[in-house]
Amino acid sequence: HKIGLKQRGGSTLGGRKVWFDHDVLRLNYDGRGQYLGEFQSDESILIIQNNGDFYTTDFDLNNHYDADIQRIEKYDPEKVWTAVLYDADQQNYPYLKRFTFEATAKKQNYLGDNKHSKLILLSEQVFPRIQVVFGGHDDFREPLIVEASDFVGVKSYKAKGKRLTTYTVGNIEELEPTRMPEPEDTTEPEAGDDEATNDDGDNGQMNLF
């Protein structure tokens, strides 16, 4: 039998359910505020701030959090995020990047070191679609619709990403996705089907990434 350690709210059986109260910016185990999930002792919380800073914490009730929280959730190291930003290092052209957040107690910034870079949108969709509507002297152009997963690969959060356009932009927004991730197949493979199963797995990876 697997016995968990009683640590930072951990339970001897199963995990610890954790909530975040946005009014007081504190965690609790009593059902107040946003439900973050059920945590094992080695799992952590991801905090994303409006200025692009992010960091991870444990789920200790004594933790303090800043007010300008854009997202707070259970940290998933494999979750892919899509960001569109005006890159101040690149003449404020709009860039699209896809990345995973790293576990870090020290604040990092996924928008880069230039404080003048500006976030346009941050999406957690698996297959996000981005629409660029042109403005100014380019407003006669048809809107550009980008399938983010086809446009750029998943890199580090430090990567620049890929420029969307050099034309004058009116606005950029996220559209409803037309593709959804396929549900995971939990059925046991039959004997002798190993090769077919492996092939399917490879294809699935290629489709996702």
Q: What is the predicted role of each segment?
A:
Residues 1-209:
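C-terminal interaction appendages of subunits in large macromolecular complexes
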